[in-house]
């Protein structure tokens, strides 16, 4: 209907009972906490929500909760009623599933990507030394009701790629996945697929302007990309938030540019601080929706007031508003691993 928005989040830092809220006016106001199945209280990681459709045309919403085993809840009535959390297999992962790709030309087929650091992929797995991060893919052929055994996309002890966020190219032929680099040695990374995720390119670094965590993207009506993420860089992690040369280190950030900027490794058009987080990097698992009138609705948590507990805010903005602000905003001087205001 273009107005109803559903939001889930943990009552805690990742682990904790899942809280569920609804907005009936496109994020302007939100309900009180809604009733949830009893075992949603046992969630161990940040929940993720996806809309899916099976090959018969049946719509449903699915919600994942991570660690071992990955569990899933299902709603067949647009979020009014939900099942409890049930395991999807004998495998686990951190923040499952990080992103969902609808397989082109195959109704009801979805590819979900997630990561693990060695601790949760099986019931007997353990973290090794040095720590190895692995990016996985799991395929559903029945509209998200069942999920296949995870396949490894990339695994490394040198760079720790995780928290995938997928973007389809404007012509629909290519998929890009932006990745957090959790060893904090390098910029964020990107991988590409031209066969609907059956295989992927080797990872390569993104521009410093897109470096951070939990990238979530939507196309603006004019064809540009809006990508919301947490700004965290290698140099900032080394020096600390307050000593980082990066203007928006530790803040809720966004990037506007073209898909081809990502392909070319270019910096894009704008880097935006959506909100100033007051405590380290403790912020931002950003959801992003494009409303019917072209408004971006993006929602996440952070420490928005000094000395206060974190809370969740929704921000609404339009591309023309950002363009107007940019005319009177300072420019960035960009190097490969740092940037600062001119």
Please provide the spans of the model-predicted regions.
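Asp-box/BNR beta-propeller blade signature and adjacent active/binding-site loops
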Residues: 1-342
């Amino acid at each position: 209907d273009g107005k109803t928005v559903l939001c889930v989040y943990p009552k805690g830092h990742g682990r904790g009972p899942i809280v569920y809220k609804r907005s009936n006016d496109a994020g302007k106001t939100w309900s009180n906490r809604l009733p949830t199945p009893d075992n949603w209280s046992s969630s161990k990681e940040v929940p993720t929500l996806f809309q899916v459709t099976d090959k018969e045309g049946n719509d449903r919403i699915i919600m994942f909760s991570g660690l071992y085993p990955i569990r899933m809840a299902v709603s067949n009535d647009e979020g009014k009623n939900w099942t409890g959390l049930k395991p999807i297999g004998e495998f686990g992962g951190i923040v499952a599933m990080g992103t969902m790709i609808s397989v082109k030309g195959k109704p009801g087929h979805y590819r979900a990507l997630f990561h693990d650091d060695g601790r949760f992929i099986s019931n007997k797995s353990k973290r090794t030394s040095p720590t190895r991060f692995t990016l996985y893919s799991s395929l559903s052929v029945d509209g998200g009701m069942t999920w296949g055994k995870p396949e490894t996309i990339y695994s490394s002890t040198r760079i720790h790629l995780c928290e995938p966020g997928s973007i389809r190219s404007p012509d629909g032929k290519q998929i890009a996945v932006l990745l957090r680099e959790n060893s904090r040695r390098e910029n964020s990374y990107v991988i590409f697929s031209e066969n609907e995720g059956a295989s992927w390119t080797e990872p390569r670094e993104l521009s410093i302007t897109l470096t951070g965590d939990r990238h979530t993207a939507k196309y603006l009506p004019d064809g540009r990309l809006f990508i919301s993420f947490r700004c965290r860089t290698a140099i900032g992690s080394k020096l600390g938030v307050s000593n980082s040369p990066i203007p928006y280190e530790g803040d809720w950030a966004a990037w506007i540019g073209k898909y081809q900027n990502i392909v070319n490794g270019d910096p894009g058009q704008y880097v935006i601080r959506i909100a100033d987080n007051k405590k380290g990097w403790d912020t931002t698992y950003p959801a992003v929706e494009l409303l019917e009138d072209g408004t971006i609705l993006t929602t996440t948590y952070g420490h928005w007031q000094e000395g206060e507990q974190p809370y969740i805010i929704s921000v609404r903005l339009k591309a023309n508003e950002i363009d107007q602000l940019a005319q009177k905003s300072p420019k960035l001087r960009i190097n490969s691993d740092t940037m600062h205001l001119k």
